[in-house]
Amino acid sequence: MDGRLFKDELLYCEGKHKPWFRGKIHLASLVFLPVAVYYISFSNSPWVYFNLFGNILCFGVSGFYHTFEWSPSTELFMQKLDHQAISLWTVTMMTPIAFHLFPTETRVKFLTILLSTFIANSYATWTSQPSTILASSIPGTLLLFSGECWKHMDSMEWTCMLLAFAFQSSGTVAYVLSNKGYRLCGNDTIYGYHELFHTATLFAAYFVYMVNYTIAVREPRFP
């Protein structure tokens, strides 16, 4: 094989189906970057900027990969980089929670599991052995510590975290349906399940941003 991520799937340069909105949703989302930077400037937390970097990388790579035309070798690399960026974004979205809300012992346990799932999924990505379950285990790490989140988050942060999980989970379902060849509406020439996945990730990113912003601007409970 030529190292493609999904062995039985065509590349875009080989004629893979691509609705008009494919990639453009994530690319357009970058216009909100100045607003995001403005609000987190009220925080001295480096971890919130780390989360913002993850957002820029994830949506930037996704937007460029899906929107523009690439040579076969470049597209193969961009495809894996796209999935790698999603994994890193998932890590960065939870890092502020670990450093601002969790006590040291809990933080160490959380980061150990989180980084282990990230490394495992990264290896699977670059060796062309992708797994939705393995990828989902990265954000799933936070569910193991939901009791700690409940204990240390305020009501708005808790609600935003649940909404982020709801949107990301629904997006994952849409992504799986897209990979299995299901069509959302007719031939999906404009908008399909993969675009629904991209839309859901934007809502998830917004609610995660709100969680990280609010915990960063208030006094950390566990320095």
Range-by-range predicted roles:
Residues 1-223:
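Multi-pass alpha-helical transmembrane bundles in non-GPCR membrane proteins
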